[in-house]
Amino acid sequence: MNVGRTVKVTQAVVDLKFEGELPRIFNALKSKLEYRGKELILEVSQHIGDNIVRCIAMDSTNGVSRNDEFVDTGAPISVPVGRSTLGRIFNVVGEVIDECGPLKGKYDLESIHRVPPSFTEQKIQEEVLVTGIKVIDLLAPYLKGGKIGLFGGAGVGKTVLIMELINNIAKAHKGFSVFAGVGERTREGNDLYHEMITSNVINVNEHEKSQAVLVYGQMNEPPGARARVALTALTMAEYFRDHENQDVLFFVDNIFRFTQAGSEISALLGRMPSAVGYQPTLATDMGAMQERIASTTSGSITSVQAIYVPADDLTDPAPAATFSHLDSTTVLSRQIAEMGIYPAVDPLDSTSQSLSAEIVGEEHYKVTSEVKRILQTYKSLQDIIAILGMDELSDEDKITVDRARKIQKFFSQPFHVAEVFTGMPGKFVSLSDTVSSFKGIVEGEYDHLPEAAFYMVGNIDEAIKKAELIKDETKVGAKS
């Protein structure tokens, strides 16, 4: 048994001295004593000479003192994988934390540090993943097996959008989802769990019938947990892909906190900071995780990653490091959120590599191009409208502005997960309905309908019904 003794504790970093063989980098070390009723797990990060290893703690180091003993497990942190993990909540070291008893059934243990699939194993799929959210399916469609980034500042709706995506995709595609809560609010993690129970994504009585696994390392936890929890969740997703031949959905909320935790650890390990105080290994850390999110001949992992943008600055090194790995970007705009349009997706900033006639089809591509042209024209006319008003525009421009406003309003959509707050039932809109509805708007088929009819509805038929209701209400108001 290889035992090390504590020589120094600096917040989440612990130095241990080993008399015998040094444990390898990434090996897990277990405490002999219990702290706050449980063992403390450390991960070896550096060999710093004189038989001393520097480790990152996966939980609080409160109570750890000099000469406390830690045992080398001889392997990296290993977590449970397999169908028995479905419907359960785990922490970074693979312990269940949902108070539903120990893990039942068969499961394997896998290391959280794994090698990405080789080039020969990887496979590119060109199939669109329908989300049921109009603005995404039309303007920035997601590819099966792709990497999607949800960019947005604080409070513009990233978490709600992720919750809706989990809900819609679980119901429509019946695939397994793995959710990594990285450094976000504990309340949101709790809300998501109960929302999944309500929508039958998680079955608390028969866990094996569930379709999701939750792995949490929330913002009250030390940086070690926040830096590794995404890898724990990814390991579980990889098992479903490789051994169950599943098309898995991997959600991360929030990838910025993964970078932030790495930055905290880097400072505690004594590394020289890089641009804006981030760790010098930012690109390496990000690449090591992102390269594991891949589609193979066995199955696929489609990842949706919420990315907090500090001070709404997309050039910040943390979001910028993520950009190069993504296939689609969904940018959430504060200006659109202030207009009351939810989801607050910016239609001109959001992009997708799958938006080509070969993948989405000729009609979809043409409708999207026309929608973007109308919105871009409207954007360029806004200064003129602000200074001179609508009356100074040409008749053609007036029609363009009218259609652009209807398109903007029609991008809004009631969400299933927000029914409690909005009082409106959620809508899942099929891709064919989305394309045909927007085609009708850009071709002027619905020019006679009022702008308000397009707000917070599903397909175009609902907008027509809403227009009739508005007309009837106007008549009643006029009579009274």
From Swiss-Prot:
Keywords: ATP synthesis, ATP-binding, Cell membrane, CF(1), Hydrogen ion transport, Ion transport, Membrane, Nucleotide-binding, Translocase, Transport. It is found in: Cell membrane. NCBIfam families: atpD (TIGR01039). Transmembrane segments: none annotated. Pfam families: ATP-synt_ab (PF00006), ATP-synt_ab_N (PF02874), ATP-synt_VA_C (PF22919). One of its GO terms (cellular component) is plasma membrane. Its EC number is 7.1.2.2. SUPFAM superfamilies: C-terminal domain of alpha and beta subunits of F1 ATP synthase, N-terminal domain of alpha and beta subunits of F1 ATP synthase, P-loop containing nucleoside triphosphate hydrolases. The keyword Membrane applies. It catalyses: ATP + H2O + 4 H(+)(in) = ADP + phosphate + 5 H(+)(out). ATP binds at residues 152-159. F-type ATPases have 2 components, CF(1) - the catalytic core - and CF(0) - the membrane proton channel. CF(1) has five subunits: alpha(3), beta(3), gamma(1), delta(1), epsilon(1). CF(0) has three main subunits: a(1), b(2) and c(9-12). The alpha and beta chains form an alternating ring which encloses part of the gamma chain. CF(1) is attached to CF(0) by a central stalk formed by the gamma and epsilon chains, while a peripheral stalk is formed by the delta and b chains. It comes from the Bacteria. CDD domains: ATP-synt_F1_beta_C, ATP-synt_F1_beta_N, F1-ATPase_beta_CD. Produces ATP from ADP in the presence of a proton gradient across the membrane. The catalytic sites are hosted primarily by the beta subunits. HAMAP family: ATP_synth_beta_bact. GO terms for molecular function: ATP binding; ATP hydrolysis activity; proton-transporting ATP synthase activity, rotational mechanism. It is a peripheral membrane protein. This is ATP synthase subunit beta. Belongs to the ATPase alpha/beta chains family. Its main location: membrane. InterPro entries: AAA+_ATPase, ATP-synt_VA_C, ATP_synth_F1_bsu, ATPase_a/bsu_AS, ATPase_alpha/beta_chains, ATPase_F1/V1/A1_a/bsu_N, ATPase_F1/V1/A1_a/bsu_N_sf, ATPase_F1/V1/A1_a/bsu_nucl-bd.
